[in-house]
């Protein structure tokens, strides 16, 4: 079995357990569920230039613990102060040491920046969970879903007011997508079966996608020259996690990466 298969199996068990512990009716009574309208991820990515989705992540299967001590709310506040277009929050507990509580803590401290629940969404129950802890958007991984599941989850998320970042890795994943449904597409440079990284994967995949869909490159991004290449190729946003998590001050690292990219772009244009 691949790493992705292991994670999906574990997620399936966790979801069934949480359904028993916290019914959907109880989730819908939580303050974040209906006291605020979710923010639009697509709108956040329309700002001029390359948008940054900054990630809050303690660990990963490929790297182990990345940041310790780990204060999710403080990190997210730094990102917001340094103009992240959106903030991605890992909530998967067994392989990434994430938690739904991290999202709720961050929402309480960062009210005006879109929050993306980054997890392995396989059940509509997880969408209600996301809304209940203050998420504005969810990640839907096409590799982990069949076309029917992907369409069903996307429709259910939209009905709840949540944006979707639909993620692909392989060209075959594109065949699963209803392009009338999807407004933001992410391409993961990391193979979720092996966790190996190919930084050119985004460029290859985006070259085959329709115009008008928001484009987000994900994983393995830390070099400003690569970011400039992506922007020139029509990419709207980048999702960056490990590079920022390893910095002493993640927010400052975000601003520095953005500034270095702009400097390189200006030099190439001039």
Curated annotation (Swiss-Prot):
Keywords: Amino-acid biosynthesis, Aromatic amino acid biosynthesis, Decarboxylase, Lyase, Tryptophan biosynthesis. It is an enzyme of class 4 (lyase). GO terms for biological process: L-tryptophan biosynthetic process. Pfam families: IGPS (PF00218). InterPro entries: Aldolase_TIM, Indole-3-glycerol_P_synth, Indole-3-glycerol_P_synth_dom, Indole-3-GlycerolPSynthase_CS, RibuloseP-bd_barrel. It comes from Salinibacter ruber (strain DSM 13855 / M31). Its EC number is 4.1.1.48. It comes from the Bacteria. This is Indole-3-glycerol phosphate synthase. Pathway: Amino-acid biosynthesis; L-tryptophan biosynthesis; L-tryptophan from chorismate: step 4/5. Gene3D superfamilies: Aldolase class I (3.20.20.70). The gene is trpC. Belongs to the TrpC family.
């Amino acid at each position: 079995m691949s790493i992705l298969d292991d994670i999906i199996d574990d997620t399936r068990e966790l979801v069934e357990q949480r359904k028993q512990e916290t019914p959907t009716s109880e989730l819908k009574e939580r303050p974040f569920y209906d006291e605020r309208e979710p923010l639009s991820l697509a709108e956040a990515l329309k700002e001029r230039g390359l948008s940054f989705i900054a990630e809050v992540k303690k660990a990963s299967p490929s790297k182990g613990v990345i940041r310790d001590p780990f204060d999710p709310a403080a990190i997210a506040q730094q990102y917001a102060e340094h103009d992240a277009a959106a903030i991605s929050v890992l909530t998967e507990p067994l392989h990434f040491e994430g938690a739904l509580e991290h999202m709720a803590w961050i929402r309480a401290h960062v009210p005006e920046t879109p929050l993306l629940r980054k997890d392995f969404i396989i059940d509509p129950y997880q969408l209600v969970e996301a809304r209940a802890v203050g998420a504005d958007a969810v990640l839907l991984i096409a590799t982990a879903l069949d076309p029917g599941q992907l369409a069903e989850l996307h429709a259910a998320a939209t009905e709840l007011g949540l944006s979707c970042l639909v993620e692909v890795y392989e060209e075959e994943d594109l065949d699963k997508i209803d392009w009338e449904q999807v407004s933001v597409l992410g391409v993961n440079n990391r193979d979720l079966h092996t966790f190996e990284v190919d930084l050119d994967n985004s460029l290859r995949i985006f070259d085959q996608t329709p115009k008008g869909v928001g484009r987000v490159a994900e994983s393995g991004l830390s070099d400003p020259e690569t970011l400039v290449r992506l922007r020139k190729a029509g990419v709207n946003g980048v999702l960056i996690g490990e590079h920022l998590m390893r910095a002493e001050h993640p927010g400052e690292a975000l601003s520095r990466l953005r500034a270095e990219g702009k400097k390189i772009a200006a030099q190439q244009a001039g």
